[in-house]
Amino acid sequence: MEYGERLAAFRRGELSEGWRFFGAHREGEGWRFRVWAPMAQRVSVVGEFNGWDVEAAPMAGADGIWEAWVSGPEAGQLYKFAVWGRDGQLRYKTDPYAFWAEVRPGTAGRLTEESAFPWGDGRYRRERRAVYGGPLNIYEVHLGSWRRWEDGSFLSYRELGEELAEYVRDMGYTAVELLPVTEHPLDESWGYQCTGYFAPTSRFGTPEDFRW
């Protein structure tokens, strides 16, 4: 879908893949930033790449959509949007479409390259068995409290992938249901206070670790 088509679909309330349009995306030698801020008077991109200077990367706004192409940022660097509201006050906002977030208590997004990981279910579909005639045993699990190291630190996505897979297989479970894994502020919660719908929580590693 081209830019114009996505813009028209967004305005009709029919853009089902907003994450491809908004947020931060690698574009040539720089990054394209785009955010929906209809009440803003002014918006700019700030981050580690420009010293958090609100004057360094101003965004152009049209019909509530603000965007800018910025040269120089590198994957992994932190960023936010500096937004001046109708009241004239400057507020720093996290990108709601960020694919990777700063580890709590920080709230910035991290620039993330699109992965070359070949998402698909072809292998599963080729090898799947007829399961509906047998029992279904679902293991619902919260990754942060399922198992930890002796010092109380979390296992990483990669460590959880190995240990949890072995555990559910040995226990005879046929399916796994993960409690929320998107970014959230409190370690004490189960993850339902989501602050980033497109970012797997950084508590357990990077987006690449999550894909592992």
Segments predicted by a language model, with ranges:
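Short beta-strand elements bearing conserved aromatic residues within extracellular beta-rich modules
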Residues: 43-45, 79
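Short amphipathic alpha-helices and their capping/turn segments at secondary-structure boundaries
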Residues: 126-128, 161-172
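Aromatic-lined carbohydrate-binding/catalytic grooves of carbohydrate-active enzymes
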Residues: 155, 166-211
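Short proline/glycine-enriched turn/loop motifs at strand-loop junctions of beta-rich domains
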Residues: 36-43
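The feature marks proteins involved in alpha-glucan
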Residues: 1-32, 60-140, 145-152, 159
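Conserved residues at the C-terminal ends of beta-strands
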Residues: 46, 142-144, 179, 200
